[in-house]
A protein has these predicted regions:
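Glycine/proline-enriched, intrinsically flexible loops and inter-domain linkers
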Residues: 1-168
């Protein structure tokens, strides 16, 4: 699936620079969330991590309207579920997936957006696709082994390619 997109529109979010320019907000981190896409013949798209805070001297409220907090996307035809949404402050204080919430000066909100569900059995995914996912950091070695049964020799091939700057 497509990575870091919203369902059902399939569009990506506003650029970090535009968000920071519009208000006293700092986006400390915005990156793909490895292992968040459900395993499958067609792997679910990855969610993303975002860490947001206010500029020095500011506090803020967040109007949370997050989906897939309690019910991650379910896989189809043997595919695995995507990872759920999580939201918390940087000190570990959990936040609600819905509603207006205050964030004190100096605190950050850490969000992990959900991954898409997998489609079809993970065992049917082409080995070359699994190796490419591993090389790109979309999946971890643990997921490559557990969900896709990627052999140690294939994992070593990927790690060697990464170390030498080769594409898989």
């Amino acid at each position: 699936g497509l990575n870091a997109t919203a369902f059902p529109s399939g569009v990506m979010t506003m650029p970090v620079e535009a968000t920071e320019h519009a208000g006293p907000v700092i986006i400390w981190r915005k990156e793909l969330r490895p292992d968040s896409g459900g395993a499958g013949k067609q792997r679910g798209g990855l969610g993303q991590f975002m860490e947001v805070g206010a500029r020095e001297g500011h506090e803020f409220d967040i109007q949370a309207m997050f989906d897939r907090v309690d019910h991650p996307a379910n896989g189809r035809r043997g595919g695995g579920p995507g990872a759920p949404t999580t939201i918390a402050q940087d000190d570990g204080t959990k936040m609600n997936g819905k509603g207006k919430q205050f964030v004190a000066h100096g605190r950050r909100v850490v969000m992990a957006f959900p991954g898409g569900a997998g489609y079809g059995a993970a065992s049917a995914r082409a080995k070359a696709s699994v190796m490419r996912d591993l090389a790109r950091g979309y999946i971890s070695v643990a997921v490559a082994k557990r969900d896709y049964a990627l052999a140690d020799a294939d994992i070593a091939t990927v790690m060697d390619a990464i170390a030498s700057g080769q594409d898989i």
